[in-house]
């Protein structure tokens, strides 16, 4: 129910974590420690370990299902660096269009499966939960007919994304209004960690009035771009020894501090030191969007400011997607599994989506259990 291939994942211009055997310098232990550190020690270690260990298998499943991850001239997967990662382990598709690459490949599989009925132009209005706290279905509003319909279910999965549109400035699409969390809350599900909302440090900020904040992936900083203030001075060394590659919450607070000092609505991201051919090949979507705004990212700094980006909190769920209501499951950003703690590590979100979806699908007798 809903729009297949909606913008939530398509907008992901970062990548997906892959702790793979093809990358001998990396290991599960390193990824786990990076995740726990970024999450301010509030992540659930067992969840982090499980999802990290599963990454090799699910990445290869994605490849088998048609996701074309970027490779070098020798045909080997290329790994890139993003903030708070201790090693290059991020996979991309189409340079800076990883979310689109994964979503479009999986949507093709969905539409080709005769056993899957897709209901688009339909909005979930209310969950049907009985007196025993078991989900029996959902009331759906059909936007084409203007009528409400009841869909009875043996298992219902919420994968409704985040809530960035609750904020003035956000990188999220219009549909990111937290509706899935609201549906679950009204049905009596346990909601947790809603105080933890991540602000991405670098969203395109052309003016204070511009509310559509196009995401400038931190992968640009991973390739060497530097943050500068309105006087052209670098400043991140004052805030953290990893500079631009510090955890997102630290970089965001540093940018806000510089903006407040100068009474400005933005700072700038200077990518001119990156090889120009590499820059345009690696970030085609970003360079195109900035070009449409009159910014040649190889020569001119990009105006950026923090914007609401990701909710760590949501519907309390296990890694299999089980919630406190039997028969109701939640995966992705609307769920809160304990993976992200207080601050999500870059590119862990797509990995969580895929791992939890696979585990939900393969779990035996899911209806018999719930999360307390």
Task: Give the residues covered by each predicted segment.
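Short beta-strand to alpha-helix junction loop
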Residues: 47-53, 91-105, 171-173, 178, ...
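Conserved redox-cofactor binding core of oxidoreductases
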Residues: 63-147, 152, 159, 203-207
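FAD-binding beta-loop-beta segment adjacent to the flavin cofactor pocket
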Residues: 310-330
């Amino acid at each position: 129910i809903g729009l297949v291939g909606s913008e939530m994942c398509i907008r992901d211009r970062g990548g997906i974590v892959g702790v793979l055997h093809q990358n001998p310098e990396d290991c599960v232990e390193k990824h786990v420690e990076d995740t726990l550190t970024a999450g301010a020690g509030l992540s659930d270690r067992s969840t982090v370990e499980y999802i990290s260990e599963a990454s090799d298998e699910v990445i290869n499943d994605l490849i088998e299902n048609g996701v074309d991850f970027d490779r070098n001239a020798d045909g080997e997967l290329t790994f890139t660096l993003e903030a708070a990662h201790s090693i290059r382990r991020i996979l991309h598709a189409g340079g800076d269009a990883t979310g689109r690459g994964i979503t479009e490949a999986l949507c093709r599989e969905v539409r080709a499966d005769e056993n899957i009925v897709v209901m688009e132009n339909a909005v979930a209005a209310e969950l049907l939960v009985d007196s025993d706290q078991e989900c029996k279905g959902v009331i759906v509003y059909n936007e084409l007919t203007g009528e409400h319909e009841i869909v009875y279910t043996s298992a219902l999965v919420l994968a409704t994304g985040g809530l960035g549109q609750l904020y003035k400035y956000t990188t999220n699409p219009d549909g990111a209004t937290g509706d899935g969390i609201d549906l679950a809350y009204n049905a009596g599900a346990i909601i947790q960690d809603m105080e933890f909302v991540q602000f991405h440090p670098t969203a395109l900020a052309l003016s204070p009035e511009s509310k559509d904040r196009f995401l400038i992936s931190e992968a640009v900083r991973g390739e060497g771009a530097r943050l500068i203030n309105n006087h052209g001075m670098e400043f991140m060394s004052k805030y953290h020894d990893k500079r631009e590659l510090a955890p997102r919450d630290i970089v965001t607070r540093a940018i806000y501090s510089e903006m407040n000092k100068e009474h400005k609505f933005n700072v700038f991201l200077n990518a001119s030191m990156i090889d120009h051919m590499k820059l345009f090949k690696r970030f085609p979507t970003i360079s195109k969007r900035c070009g449409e705004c009159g910014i040649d990212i190889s020569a001119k700094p990009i105006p950026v400011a923090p914007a609401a980006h990701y909710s760590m909190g949501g519907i309390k769920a296990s890694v299999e997607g089980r919630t406190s209501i039997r028969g109701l499951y939640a995966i992705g950003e609307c769920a809160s599994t304990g993976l992200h703690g207080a601050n999500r590590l870059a590119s862990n979100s797509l990995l969580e989506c895929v791992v939890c979806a696979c585990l939900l699908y393969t779990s035996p007798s899911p209806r018999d259990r719930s999360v307390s």
